[in-house]
Amino acid sequence: MRYPIATFDCYGTLVDWEGGFGSFLYAKALASGDEGPPPGRELRERFEAIQFDLIQREYRPYKEILAETLRRLCDERGWPFERGDAEAIVTAMRSFQPFPDTRPALRRVRAAGTRLVIVSNTDRDIIEHTLRQLEVPFDDVQVAEDVGAYKPSDEVFRRLLERLGERPERVLHVAFGFKYDIGPAERAGMRTAWVNRHQEPPPTVVAYDHEWRDLWGLASLVEDAD
């Protein structure tokens, strides 16, 4: 087997983070009386940009990051930030669904003998809901709450490798995001796989080892290595 361990970004790689937040934010826009809101994707991209700025500051629990990100987006758009919005966005995230390929592909990867590990920018009580949605056992889960830091901090991947007790070149990190995942995993010496679900052109400044449109590519890789 080529990679004894596969580590995964969760939201955006295994779970439809983009669609989930896009739908939530578009519904918030309409409920706020925004007569000409941009598409959900545009709102989600702005939400992500605000969030990325916040997670690079002093560590705060992810639920607080979500609430502050939404509050700032509401301020920008002229929407009211209402009582209950902070809890509503956390509740929405807990219900985000896996991509159609996620469960069956992960079952194949696990059946091939590869250990499955999640490394996620979230809180423990949020990821626990998502794990129930995934329905596939994971050997370990590391969240930002465990480390006191968020990806793309190099500390996240240093602690991950320490936790795994494996040489970095024997660990494959699977993710859709370059700035959060592929770049810092490469710096840590891990092998990397880009899940390019939207068939986007690759950035020219970050190297990676594999590229697939979905997780079926990973399943084939580990099965062929047996």
Where are the regions a protein language model picked out?
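N-terminal helical cap/lid subdomain that shapes the substrate entry/recognition surface
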Residues: 1-103, 111-112
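Asp-based, Mg2+/Mn2+-dependent phosphohydrolase catalytic module
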Residues: 1-4, 18, 38, 80, ...
